[in-house]
Amino acid sequence: MDEILVLVDKHDNPIGSAGKADIHQKGMLHRAFSIFVFDNKGNLLLQKRAATKYHSAGLWTNSCCGHPRVGEALEAAAHRRLGEEMGFDCPLKKVSSFIYHAILPNNLIEYEYDHVFIGRFDKEPIINLDEVSDYKWVNLLKLRALINNAPDVYTVWFKKIINGLSYQDIEEWQRLI
């Protein structure tokens, strides 16, 4: 069954709902979240999206991402997806929000009001192979070079977030968790 997601205006006020597939085919602005999980050494947990995902399949991205369902609190949805995709939960802190729009290679359209959460976890995840095909911990100082050397292997939203951060922003995130 197609998930029903929250449509929002440019101020993140709910204005309706629609099916996930319809939203991404028509490019409707909807609520989403991106989670960045760090270990105690400051490494970022990346996941490789499963090859069966209907968009951005097989691409590397942030620790977890998803959408709240209608009636579901944003942070509750973030915790739900972290467990569903990565097999663990941890305290999360919201650090920013932004709107982005991108046309994906398969003619799907991402138009999201994306809320960014950070967390800390120091064990290995137990990935759900229906969602995630691989994971790795990456040193943040090397991450931009990795993305610049092979931009096509990373999701659009992940590149947008990372490229929009200064090293001071990343250091601040580290202090917050």
From Swiss-Prot:
BP-aspect Gene Ontology terms: dimethylallyl diphosphate biosynthetic process; isopentenyl diphosphate biosynthetic process
Keywords of this entry: Cytoplasm, Isomerase, Isoprene biosynthesis, Magnesium, Manganese, Metal-binding
Cofactor-binding details, from the entry: Binds 1 Mg(2+) ion per subunit. The magnesium ion binds only when substrate is bound. Binds 1 Mn(2+) ion per subunit.
Cofactor: Mg(2+); Mn(2+)
Enzyme Commission numbers on file: 5.3.3.2
GO molecular function: isopentenyl-diphosphate delta-isomerase activity; metal ion binding
Active-site residues, Swiss-Prot/TrEMBL: C65, E112
GO annotations of cellular component type: cytoplasm
Subcellular location(s) per record: Cytoplasm
Binding site for Mg(2+): C65, E85
Enzyme class at the top of the EC tree: isomerase
Domain Nudix hydrolase: 28-160
Catalytic activity: isopentenyl diphosphate = dimethylallyl diphosphate
Pathway(s) served: Isoprenoid biosynthesis; dimethylallyl diphosphate biosynthesis; dimethylallyl diphosphate from isopentenyl diphosphate: step 1/1
Any one Pfam family match given in the protein's UniProt record, by short name: NUDIX
Binding residues annotated for Mn(2+), in chain numbering: H24, H30, H67, E110, E112
Keyword Magnesium: yes
Subunit text: Homodimer.
NCBIfam families (UniProt xref): IPP_isom_1, PRK03759.1
HAMAP family: Idi
Role of this protein: Catalyzes the 1,3-allylic rearrangement of the homoallylic substrate isopentenyl (IPP) to its highly electrophilic allylic isomer, dimethylallyl diphosphate (DMAPP).
PANTHER family per the UniProt record, alphabetical: ISOPENTENYL-DIPHOSPHATE DELTA-ISOMERASE
Recorded family membership: Belongs to the IPP isomerase type 1 family.
The protein's name in its UniProt record: Isopentenyl-diphosphate Delta-isomerase 2
Species, as recorded: Photorhabdus laumondii subsp. laumondii (strain DSM 15139 / CIP 105565 / TT01)
